[in-house]
Structures are given as C-alpha cells and as structure tokens.
C-alpha cells in the first residue's frame, strides 16, 4: 500500500518536462505542501484505504487535475512547476470544491438588512483604518444588491468579525504568515456568516501584503453565500492579488444578484470583465517586448507569451508592478538600458525587471519635449538597432533618439505618409525580428519598415495559439 507522500513523489518522477525540474532539496517540502493543499481545498482523503481502492485511478491525480482545471492550468495530474507556483500563492482558506457551509443547498440570508460586529482589532492598523476597510468592503456588495449593512458594537450580529491565529476552535486553523489569509462561513445560524482573519498576517491599507480591504471584501462574499470563482478577474477568485482598485467584476455582480436580486439603484452597476485571449474581438491598450517575451496589456491585465511556452499567461499587471496604474496606454522596451517604459496620460514610468525605478512617474513633456497639446501617447516602439523611438499620437508620430535623449528635427509627421496602409491611428505597436506589428481595433498589421510595406494582416490575438479566430 502506497503512502500519500510516496505516491506524490512517484508522480513527480513521471512529471512533465515542459517546466523546470523541482530541486531535490525542496522536493519533500513541496510534496507535503501539495498533500496539504489538496486536503484543505479539494477534499483529498489522506487515508491509505482510499488510495488502495483506487490504485489504478489515483485520487491524488484526480484532485490535481481538478485543481489545475479550476485555475486554468494545463491539466496533467502532475505537480509541475506551474501548479506548485499557484499552490504557493496566498489565498482564502475556504475550499474550492469541498463543503464549507452550515446549511444545505444554496445558503442565503432571508433578511436583507444585516448587522456586523468587529469583535477585536488587529494592532497592525489604527482602529479607524480597520473600521473604514470593513465598511468599504460591505459597501461594495450593497452597491450592487438590495443588501444593507449596519455596524453594531455589542451583542450578537449576523456577521461577527475577528482577528485570530492558529487553532481558533472552528475546525479550520490558520497556518501562520502567508498561505491561508482568512476564511468566512456561508449564511446560517451561530457561526454562519462569520469572518476570521489570520492575525499572523501583516494587515495594511496599501499595496503591501496584505490589504485588509481587499481580503475583507472577498471574505464577505462568502458571508453572503458566494463560492469561489474560476474567473481570475473576479473578487471571488481564491488567490490573493491586489490590483490597486478593489472592485467587483461582472462575474461577482452576476453571482450576488443571482442570490439576492438586483440593486435598488435606477441604473444597474456594471463591473469589468476579464479578457479572454481567444476572443476574436479582443483589443489591446498597449504592447511591448520585455527580455525576449511579449506582453499585451488590457485594462487591469497583461497577457504574456514567450518562445518556450505556447500558452498565453493572463494575470494582473499588479503582480509584476503594483505601483503601475491600470489602463496603460503605451509601452516600449529600451533594450540597451534593460528598461521598459509605460505611459498613461501625461506621465510615464520606467521599470527594470520587476522594479519601478526611483523618481518615477515623470512628465512626458519635460522628459521628451512633447508640446503641451499632447495629452497622452497612443502607442510607442523603439528600434533596437538605431535607438530611435517612435511615439504615435492621434494621426501623427514623433521620433526620439534614445542615445542623444532628444527629439529628432522635422517631427511630428503624418502616420499615413510614412506607414502606408495601417491607417491613421495606432492603438499599440511592438517590434520583433526587424518588423513592426501595428494594432488597431481587432486588426494587426505586420509592417516592414525598410520597404514600407504591409506583409500580413491578421487578428489582433493571433499570437495566442488559438484554434479559431
């Protein structure tokens, strides 16, 4: 009879070669992590009897596949590096598939006027900051539903909120810093609806780990009856990301309104939607190369491709650069400086790797010499061979010398004159293998700057290995 850790080690030996091998000195530690993760969030039974009964269809493999499918990973049933990376991310303690409820079916509050009480306060933040974070988190949900929330200072409330650590006598102990950040129980009597936050975490009111407002808003979704979402852009996605602007996605809004009905507001609120890489109508805000990869930006998200992995990675911009705003308008790489510059409005940021350089953001007029009539940059690209950077603004473009750090004389010029066939407006552009790739709406033009000719016309998302467009 195989023990669960041994079975996991055997699975590792059969692992995919698409990802880096797990170092042997950390393998045992990761095996234990995988076991605990699947037990905690995917209802894996660790008893040897179940494994023996399902010897030819291992429950470990099935649970790994279930987890990989939930997170949109390549479904292999093997604990590859990408799977381990997702498992190591901080997250909500509510399981993704197992029951974590006190009532059968789809629990909901019968009363839409709910009360909450903060039983104790974390010392990480001033009490006023905790009160504000909790109030704002509830307001997110009340804005899109008929629910109201009133704070009480004593007695039993519908939703009791506490900061605790370790084993706090609810059969769901916390695990220390990182990992399981908080959990909440779905509507019901006694502990139903209550939210617990791990006091071993450091709670903040900014982008540093962990933003209390962001985590509380997620947990209160559980308190109201919502389960986890597979939509990475949803607030109810299980893993923790801080995107700067905590908001409900359309997926979250649809979920809460399915339980309680629409908001009482005359105009129903609409939330952002997560881009789908194989959507034939997909457009981009900005695109740039970065150290051999290509990154496409849309709203709060980036989509990344590299030569070694065919699937596009979709994630939040804030994962790499929490200081950058959402809705970037232009970006380009300065390869000889190992920098990427991002633009929004009249400001730009320079980054090296995952670090935003000191002194940024800066003003585009002072740094590049744009006239005051230029309010923002639509697109930008830098030629690696010449050090010339092209800035596209409305139907004109400027050319900037990265070595001299000055605008070239004789600009701006008309886009249509020097880049015939691409139209007079550019949404995004990048250079690869000597060619420019211009994007406007759902179209992409491969352009040869030497011959000034369009070579191909394709869908904007043709880089994403989609079967149909």
UniProtKB/Swiss-Prot annotation:
Question: What regulates the activity here?
Answer: Can be activated without removal of the activation peptide.
Q: Which GO terms describe its molecular function?
A: metalloendopeptidase activity; peptidase activity; zinc ion binding
Q: List, separated by semicolons, the cofactors it needs.
A: Ca(2+); Zn(2+)
Pfam family of this protein, just one?
Answer: Peptidase_M10
Protein residues bound to Ca(2+) 2? 158, 190, 192, 194
Location(s), subcellular? Secreted, Extracellular space, Extracellular matrix
- Matches recorded under InterPro entries: Hemopexin-like_dom, Hemopexin-like_dom_sf, Hemopexin-like_repeat, Hemopexin_CS, M10A_MMP, MetalloPept_cat_dom_sf, Pept_M10_metallopeptidase, Pept_M10A
Annotated S-S bridges: 278-466
Annotated Zn(2+) 1 binding lies at 168, 170, 183, 196
Mark the residues carrying the PTM Phosphothreonine: 274
The residues listed in the UniProt record as binding Ca(2+) 3, with positions renumbered to this chain, are 175-176, 178, 180, 198, 201
Q: Which GO terms describe its cellular component?
A: extracellular matrix; extracellular region
What CDD domains does the database record attribute to this sequence?
HX, ZnMc_MMP
- EC code(s) of this entry: 3.4.24.7
Keyword Glycosyltransferase set for record: no
Question: Binding positions for Zn(2+) 2?
Answer: 92, 218, 222, 228
Catalytic machinery residues: 219
Annotated Ca(2+) 1 binding lies at 124, 199
Q: Which family does it belong to?
A: Belongs to the peptidase M10A family.
Functionally, this protein is described as follows: Cleaves collagens of types I, II, and III at one site in the helical domain. Also cleaves collagens of types VII and X.
The protein depicted here goes by the name: Interstitial collagenase
Q: Which organism is it from?
A: Equus caballus
- Lineage of the source organism? Eukaryota, Metazoa, Chordata, Craniata, Vertebrata
